[in-house]
Regions:
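Short alpha-helix capping/helix-loop boundary micro-motifs
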Residues: 105-111
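Short glycine/proline-enriched turns and hinge-like loops at secondary-structure junctions
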Residues: 62-63, 136-138
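Short, surface-exposed beta-edge/turn micro-motifs
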Residues: 44, 65-69, 119
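Short, conserved beta-strand element in jelly-roll/cupin
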Residues: 64-79, 83-86, 92-105, 147-148
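A short, N-terminal "cap"/entry segment at the start of jelly-roll beta-barrel domains
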Residues: 1-50, 59-62
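Conserved metal-binding segment of the jelly-roll/cupin
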Residues: 113-135
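A short hydrophobic beta-strand segment most commonly corresponding to one strand
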Residues: 69, 121, 137-152
Length: 152
């Protein structure tokens, strides 16, 4: 997991790499787009904006082929992050959606969520899973970018 407090800090750290430069462009564009409509830049990423409630899940979610990048637009976003190896599988991985779901082992405590500030950026690694701490009716918008794990 990598957390940047602002898009400017993200740009300073990663904009020298083409796919991350495009990720920054996608985040900037997604703040002006209609909700729930996916777009792409090149062949390495897709992006869209959704209400935070659409990301809420009672399970941890992890991916194998894409980094998930989250950037809250209107309200801070609380995200629980754990290594997949510290979780128990809660169903089969779907190659179609590139999604695996996980649960806490032995009813462990959730711990403290990572809070992504408005305009901040959270990058999830393929070895991690996340659970968004939001209710299904949360309306704050979040930019979601899926970036291929190939290359860096």
């Amino acid at each position: 997991m990598r957390l940047y407090d602002s898009l400017e800090m993200f740009d300073i750290g990663l904009s020298h790499v083409r796919k991350w430069m495009r990720c920054g462009q996608a985040i900037r564009q997604s703040t002006h787009l209609p909700l729930d409509t996916a777009y792409s830049l090149g062949d390495s990423l897709t992006f869209w904006a959704v209400p935070a409630g659409a990301l809420a899940d009672d399970r941890y979610v992890g991916h194998r082929r894409y980094h998930t990048v989250l950037s809250p637009i209107d309200e801070p976003l609380a995200v629980y992050v754990r290594p997949k190896t510290a979780l128990r599988p809660a169903g089969a991985y779907s190659d179609v959606s590139d999604r695996g779901r996980f649960g806490l082992p032995n009813d462990d405590e959730e711990g403290v969520p990572c809070v992504v500030p408005v305009g901040g950026i959270l990058i999830m690694e393929e070895c991690e899973a996340m659970r968004i701490n939001a209710t299904s009716v949360a309306v704050g918008r979040v930019s979601v970018v899926r970036v291929t794990v190939e290359g860096f």
